Amino acid sequence: MKYADISLRLYMVFLRKYLESCGCEPDLIALIRLISRQMDPIRKAFLDNQMYEHTLNASGELQAQMDTWADEHLIKVVGESGLVRELASEEQADIIRFENSRCEYCMVMDPLDGSSLISTNLAVGTIVGIYENGGVLQPGSKLRAAFYTLFGPLTVLVVSVGKGVQSFAWDPESEHYLLLKDHFSVPEGKQYGTGGVRNEWLLPHLKVIEYFDQNGFKIRYSGSFVADCHQLLVYGGIYTYPGSEKSPNGKFRLLFEANPLGFIITQAGGRITDGRRNILNIVPEKHHQKTPVYIGSKGIIEKIEEIYKNL
């Protein structure tokens, strides 16, 4: 990232300064900055990790080499930091505890969301949620911070510490995250993306899609939850992966995907629901728990809940 007037850098807001202005504790700032700075080595590792492993993750999904690389890298860095007591990763069967931690923060993460798209060079990302009080089995409403990184033309960090949503772009020249957009507000867009298999959809979801089609919604779907959420953060609309006949609880993990992204979208004025309740209010029973997801513009979510209620 280069600027015609180098003095413009003096007026840029850096990630650290923003977090300080929000009154974040020094250890929380250190943790967010530590994790966010790992996105540069993760991005550089894409070139040498293009293939799939012959292994499955804890959710029974085929692992890409980058899933494993990013997961192991982040676990190592976080474990050595002394900033995290407990960590749950989508790629790990068990919760990891760091007994040497001097802090009581706990962390949930999807090290590389959308990794099946790596071979097609489409956008993928990393999702992170941070809680206080040393345990990961907390509702999303209790998140102290949540952020994701989107690896696209820019490496973009979207973060919320409970005071709105901001995005920062990684500047490889200065090796800092610079403020890209301040105070997102999810507009009431008319686009949607939906996962799943149509002939397995349940009646409420079929009615939801019928409503979209009858009201002129356009389909926008990439296959990466991070990328699709970022799109609706900018343009509005809805993204959904519903429950189905074969998988009534849907596909997305409550802790690693739904809660952090739902927290961010909610902080930007949107909402997240499973069709009947606010997902951020669900108390997790296990760390790989799944949930149906509808996430996006507030008005559209309210309409979806109305459709569910009337069936």
Curated annotation (Swiss-Prot):
One GO term of the biological process aspect: fructose 1,6-bisphosphate metabolic process
Annotated protein name in UniProt: Fructose-1,6-bisphosphatase class 1
Pfam family, one: FBPase_C
Cofactor binding remark: Binds 2 magnesium ions per subunit.
Chain positions recorded as substrate binding sites: D113, G114, S115, S116, Y221, K251
Keyword terms, alphabetized: Carbohydrate metabolism, Cytoplasm, Hydrolase, Magnesium, Metal-binding
Record's keyword annotation contains Magnesium: yes
GO MF, one example: fructose 1,6-bisphosphate 1-phosphatase activity
InterPro entries: FBPase_C_dom, FBPase_class-1, FBPase_N, FBPtase
Record-linked CDD domains: FBPase
EC numbers for this chain: 3.1.3.11
Record-stated family: Belongs to the FBPase class 1 family.
Subunit structure of this chain's protein: Homotetramer.
Pathway assignment: Carbohydrate biosynthesis; gluconeogenesis
Record's GO cellular component terms: cytoplasm
Subcellular location: Cytoplasm
